[in-house]
């Protein structure tokens, strides 16, 4: 820009304190494809001593994260299963077919000497109690990330019911966010939780698979933008390529490029990738709604118009470019509500030959039917290119029919939660 006051060129800039997100592939490339490291202290403790300390700590609602990490490491040494094929991720050789591995096979464990931290003990426990002790401490991880108090209370109720299957007179677990957050503040605790979940995700029939009640929260942590892609495909019935064809907003396209960055194994369910944040592979997730707000808002506005409860309850994380996102979402939701994509999945053998002959004739003689359509008329099909050209011819001003559709759907949203996309959509005029 040129300033008319001082007759000098001015370079526009705005302040930014944002951290650059790191992709999981970057972590492994920088660390020579080594496994994530877990540091375990309290080496001098044996399993029975920790069993007594932690069981008492659960009853007293007072746990030390260093005790918990050492205890988990000792328990996880004995959680085993056998690979039915090679397991590799980001160049890390986790195991070969036929190998018996443990959750600790996913990380590099470094056990360190330090001064032992004392703790009160419960002498009435033995190896059989490990099942319920592990259930409690892994559940604490999930509770720590449940910000909604009602949801957290429901989870705690479910845990207390599960404990009755292990003990005749189990301890009653209460809501103690101070305790929960103190555990997750220890990165080695979260790494062990992640390794355990990654292992149990692979071996779903393992005897310890019930622990995923708590560990599941480590999978795809801070990946809400990426996970919303699966959601929009489910709601609309579109494949990913079809959905991408409907992106008409620049910032949404930029976010899609971030999410689809190659080499990060997002399509490999057995990868380290779902544990990018919980395993400490990144300090800022590239797949979060904060890093990709446009795609996240677009998808959940679209879902809200189409009646998705999940979308209506999604948090409103940003208002950047919100007007264009609303228009894009309104168009796609209108088309998907009024232009169904259907096929004749089955035909009788009697008409099979006639069916394919007619189909061939349609392909030869059709295809140009809509090319003569006037640009001032709404497309009759669901071709995103035709819809974009139609909107472009109107300078992207929505026709009244689509505006009315959006207003009707917005009025159907009753009692939306404050701070949600559903609340934003419901207040549209």
UniProtKB/Swiss-Prot annotation:
It is found in: Virion; Host cytoplasm. GO terms for molecular function: RNA binding. InterPro entries: Rhabdo_ncapsid, Rhabdovirus_ncapsid_C, Rhabdovirus_ncapsid_N, Rhabdovirus_nucleoprotein-like. Pfam families: Rhabdo_ncap. It comes from the Viruses. GO terms for cellular component: helical viral capsid; host cell cytoplasm; ribonucleoprotein complex; viral nucleocapsid. Keywords: Capsid protein, Helical capsid protein, Host cytoplasm, Phosphoprotein, Ribonucleoprotein, RNA-binding, Viral nucleoprotein, Virion. Residues 359-376 have a biased composition (Acidic residues). SUPFAM superfamilies: Rhabdovirus nucleoprotein-like (SSF140809). Residues 355-378 are annotated as: Disordered. Its main location: virion. The keyword Phosphoprotein applies. Encapsidates the genome, protecting it from nucleases. If expressed without protein P it binds non-specifically RNA and therefore can bind it's own mRNA. Interaction with protein P abolishes any non-specific RNA binding, and prevents phosphorylation. The soluble N-P complex encapsidates specifically the genomic RNA, with protein N protecting the genome like a pearl necklace. The encapsidated genomic RNA is termed the nucleocapsid (NC) and serves as template for viral transcription and replication. Protein N binds protein P in the NC through a different interaction, and can be phosphorylated. Homomultimerizes to form the nucleocapsid. Binds to viral genomic RNA. Belongs to the ephemerovirus nucleocapsid protein family. This is Nucleoprotein. It comes from Adelaide River virus (ARV). The lineage of its organism: Viruses, Riboviria, Orthornavirae, Negarnaviricota, Haploviricotina.
């Amino acid at each position: 820009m040129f300033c008319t006051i001082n007759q000098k060129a001015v370079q526009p800039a705005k302040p930014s304190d944002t951290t650059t997100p790191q992709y999981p592939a970057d972590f492994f490339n920088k660390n020579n494809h080594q496994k994530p490291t877990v540091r375990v202290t309290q080496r001098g403790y044996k399993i029975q001593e920790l069993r007594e300390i932690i069981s008492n700590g659960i009853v007293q609602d007072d746990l030390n994260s260093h005790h918990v990490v050492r205890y988990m490491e000792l328990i996880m040494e004995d959680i085993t299963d056998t690979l039915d094929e090679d397991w590799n991720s980001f160049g890390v050789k986790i195991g070969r077919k036929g190998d018996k591995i443990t959750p600790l096979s996913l990380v590099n464990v470094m056990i360190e000497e330090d001064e032992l931290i004392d703790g009160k003990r419960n002498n009435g426990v033995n190896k059989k109690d490990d099942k319920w002790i592990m259930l409690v401490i892994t559940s604490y991880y999930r509770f720590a990330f449940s910000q909604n108090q009602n949801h957290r209370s429901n989870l705690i109720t479910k845990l207390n019911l599960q404990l009755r299957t292990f003990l005749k007179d189990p301890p009653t677990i209460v809501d103690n966010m101070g305790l929960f957050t103190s555990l997750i503040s220890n990165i080695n605790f979260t790494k062990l939780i992640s390794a355990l979940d990654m292992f149990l995700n692979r071996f779903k029939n393992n005897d310890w698979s019930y622990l995923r009640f708590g560990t599941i929260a480590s999978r795809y942590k801070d990946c809400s933008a990426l996970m919303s892609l699966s959601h929009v495909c489910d709601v609309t019935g579109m494949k990913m390529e079809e959905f991408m064809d409907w992106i008409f907003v620049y910032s949404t396209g930029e976010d899609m490029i971030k999410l689809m960055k190659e080499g990060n194994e997002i399509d490999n369910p057995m990868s380290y990738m779902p544990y990018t944040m919980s395993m400490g592979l990144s300090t800022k997730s590239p797949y979060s709604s904060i890093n990709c707000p446009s795609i996240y808002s677009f998808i959940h506005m679209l879902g809200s118009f189409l009646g998705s409860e999940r979308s209506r309850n999604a948090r409103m994380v940003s208002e950047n470019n919100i007007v264009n996102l609303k228009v894009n979402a309104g168009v796609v939701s209108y088309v998907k509500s009024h232009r169904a994509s259907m096929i004749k999945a089955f035909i009788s053998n009697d008409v099979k030959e006639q069916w394919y002959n007619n189909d061939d004739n349609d392909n030869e003689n059709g295809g140009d039917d809509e090319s003569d359509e006037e640009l001032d008329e709404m497309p009759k099909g669901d071709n995103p290119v035709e819809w974009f050209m139609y909107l472009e011819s109107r300078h992207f001003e929505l026709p009244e029919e689509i505006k009315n559709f959006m207003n009707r759907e917005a009025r159907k949203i009753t009692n939306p939660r404050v701070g949600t996309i559903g609340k934003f959509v419901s207040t549209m005029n």
